[in-house]
From Swiss-Prot:
<dbReference type="GO" id="GO:0005829">
    <property type="term" value="C:cytosol"/>
</dbReference>
<comment type="function">
    <text>Required for the nitrogen-regulated transport of amino acid permeases GAP1 and PUT4 from the Golgi to the cell surface.</text>
</comment>
<dbReference type="GO" id="GO:0005096">
    <property type="term" value="F:GTPase activator activity"/>
</dbReference>
<dbReference type="GO" id="GO:0005774">
    <property type="term" value="C:vacuolar membrane"/>
</dbReference>
<dbReference type="Pfam" id="PF11704">
    <property type="entry name" value="Folliculin"/>
</dbReference>
<dbReference type="InterPro" id="IPR021713">
    <property type="entry name" value="Folliculin"/>
</dbReference>
<dbReference type="GO" id="GO:0005737">
    <property type="term" value="C:cytoplasm"/>
</dbReference>
<dbReference type="GO" id="GO:0071230">
    <property type="term" value="P:cellular response to amino acid stimulus"/>
</dbReference>
<dbReference type="InterPro" id="IPR037520">
    <property type="entry name" value="Folliculin/SMCR8_longin"/>
</dbReference>
<protein>
    <recommendedName>
        <fullName>Protein LST7</fullName>
    </recommendedName>
</protein>
<dbReference type="InterPro" id="IPR037521">
    <property type="entry name" value="FLCN/SMCR8_DENN"/>
</dbReference>
<dbReference type="GO" id="GO:1904263">
    <property type="term" value="P:positive regulation of TORC1 signaling"/>
</dbReference>
<dbReference type="GO" id="GO:1990877">
    <property type="term" value="C:FNIP-folliculin RagC/D GAP"/>
</dbReference>
<feature type="domain" description="uDENN FLCN/SMCR8-type">
    <location>
        <begin position="48"/>
        <end position="212"/>
    </location>
</feature>
């Protein structure tokens, strides 16, 4: 099992910091069965923090790149406590911002973590915004080796996260405009400001919406799985961390 993991997390209005998806890899030549999760009840997840694949009964997604299995799940049964500790730290950081600016933290408990936050406008959310972040975790106690890996692949990793975030924001903007056809196409601040102008109706009841609904893309988490797998494979191919 690789020491490098990519997570997508969300600050849920109802549950606080929650992991939406985790992408990990297993040993080359195996099926990665230990990373799959069993069928589990989803009642403890609200609509905002639920991982939603096109087939509702699907709980895990797996692909192979050069015979290495990459698995995406709602949570990691192996790193459950670790990743929950990481997202709580990430969302509680005073430096946490949501304009795609990365920040890094490292300690012996959580390893090295690169966090990039972003937000999407949603009038049905508290504060009219939903907050997310992608996190690259290097689960290693070697600060020097982890930083070396990160510095060597900095532009690639940051660029990879930026591309996925830009895709999510763009299709979210298209979905928003599709439902608000009378709004002028001048929404550069759509996902950067919590307040979006006087044409939006206030005092609506708040309810949960996940990324599939916000983007109107039922294959979004499939795309995230494939993109994260590509990022992990590229980084892993050149680095072997203890």
């Amino acid at each position: 099992m690789s020491s490098t993991v990519i997570s997508l997390a969300h600050f849920c209005d109802k549950h606080g910091p929650r992991i939406i998806s985790v992408t990990q890899s297993a040993e080359k030549g195996t099926l990665g069965e230990e990373l799959l999760v069993p069928d589990y009840p989803t009642e403890s997840y609200c609509e905002s923090c639920l991982l939603q694949f096109p087939e509702e009964s699907t709980r895990s997604m797996r692909c192979f790149i050069e015979d290495v299995p990459f698995i995406t799940t709602q949570y990691s049964s192996i790193r459950y406590q670790l990743l929950n500790s990481i997202i709580k730290r990430a969302f509680s950081e005073e430096t946490m911002i949501y304009d795609n600016m990365p920040f890094i933290f490292f300690d012996d408990l959580r390893g090295l973590n690169l966090v990039i936050g972003f937000k999407l406008y949603d009038e049905n959310a508290r504060g009219n915004e939903r907050r997310y972040c992608f996190i690259l975790t290097v689960d290693s106690r070697s600060h020097d080796d982890s930083m070396k890996m990160l510095s060597e692949h900095w532009n690639f990793i940051i660029g990879g996260f930026d591309k996925m975030i830009a895709y999510i924001k763009n299709i979210h903007k298209s979905e928003f405009l599709g439902k608000n056809k009378t709004v002028e196409n001048n929404l550069e601040t759509l996902n950067n400001n919590a307040f979006i102008g006087s044409y939006l109706r206030a005092n609506k009841s708040k309810f949960g919406r996940n990324l599939v609904s916000l983007t109107d893309d039922k294959f979004l988490f499939v795309r995230i799985h494939k993109w994260n797998s590509f990022l992990l494979h590229t980084v892993m191919n050149e680095n072997k961390l203890p």
